[in-house]
């Protein structure tokens, strides 16, 4: 309600189309996975609001590896704690002003951590076919 008349802000509640998502200069979200897709494809930053995390594996800390969706937030944008919510506008403005820095940073990150960019479907399909062929061969040898 607060921003309904602000023409510079669009709040999306209908997710049947994602075209406008990728036109945005900045995404503000909580833990949504769309943040990574958005950042990787647009090289634009994400402002995360640090709401309580939905934990699928309550034992994750025993593994000793910080989950990807926690540490990656700091690589593709900024994180605001709930008690810092009043800093959202200022933080967003600073992030938009630094868009070139974020573009370079996200681009480097994608090159380092995203494999088979642009051909992952083909690579994945070939891998699955190879594994099926190996399983068939093992089955025939038994």
Per-region residue spans from a language model:
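Hydrophobic transmembrane alpha-helix bundles
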Residues: 13-24, 50-58, 139-142
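Catalytic binding pocket for nucleotide-activated donors in carbohydrate/polymer assembly enzymes
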Residues: 4, 33-113
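C-terminal alpha-helical cap of glycosyltransferases
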Residues: 117-142
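Donor nucleotide-activated moiety binding/catalytic core segment of transferases
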Residues: 1-36, 41
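Short beta->alpha linker loops
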Residues: 15-16, 83-84, 119
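An acidic, carboxylate-rich microenvironment
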Residues: 19, 86-87, 123
